[in-house]
């Protein structure tokens, strides 16, 4: 698994905390951050890289997390979630097979962000009854 991360200028500090934390856990990270670009371009770069390989995951950080979420969900094949708590991050992997999360640096502090990304990257898709919804989501774009 490779985790593709990025941020705009508003999320770069929290992204760096996340990058260092995941690296300390032995995770393979690719950082696509370009602070000269806004959240739309950074998010699209992450989505493109995540969609290249089935087991890639993505994390995008900006000020509030909502904009990158909206961008990511416009791309065919991407299931993303905007999260601000650990349980939602874990459950979006387990029930929705989300491959990307977005976070807001104005919403989530460093400690919670570390727990969020751990829950997300360590979560596994349960499939079963949840596959019906995932199939529905994948047909939408």
Swiss-Prot record:
Recorded superkingdom: Bacteria
Q: What class of enzyme is it?
A: isomerase
The protein's UniProt keywords, in alphabetical order, are:
Isomerase, Lactose metabolism
GO BP term, pick one: galactose catabolic process
State whether keyword Membrane applies. Answer: no
- Asked if the Swiss-Prot or TrEMBL record annotates the protein with the keyword Isomerase, the reply is yes
Q: Which Gene3D superfamilies match?
A: Sugar-phosphate isomerase, RpiB/LacA/LacB
Pfam family of the protein (one): LacAB_rpiB
Q: Which reaction does it catalyse?
A: aldehydo-D-galactose 6-phosphate = keto-D-tagatose 6-phosphate
**What is this enzyme's EC?**
5.3.1.26
Task: Enumerate the GO terms in the molecular function aspect.
Answer: galactose-6-phosphate isomerase activity; ribose-5-phosphate isomerase activity
Q: In which pathway does it act?
A: Carbohydrate metabolism; D-galactose 6-phosphate degradation; D-tagatose 6-phosphate from D-galactose 6-phosphate: step 1/1
Q: Which NCBIfam families match?
A: lacA, PRK08621.1, rpiB_lacA_lacB
Q: Which HAMAP family match?
A: LacA
Stated family: Belongs to the LacAB/RpiB family.
Listed under subunit, the entry gives:
Heteromultimeric protein consisting of LacA and LacB.
Q: What name has this protein been given in UniProt?
A: Galactose-6-phosphate isomerase subunit LacA
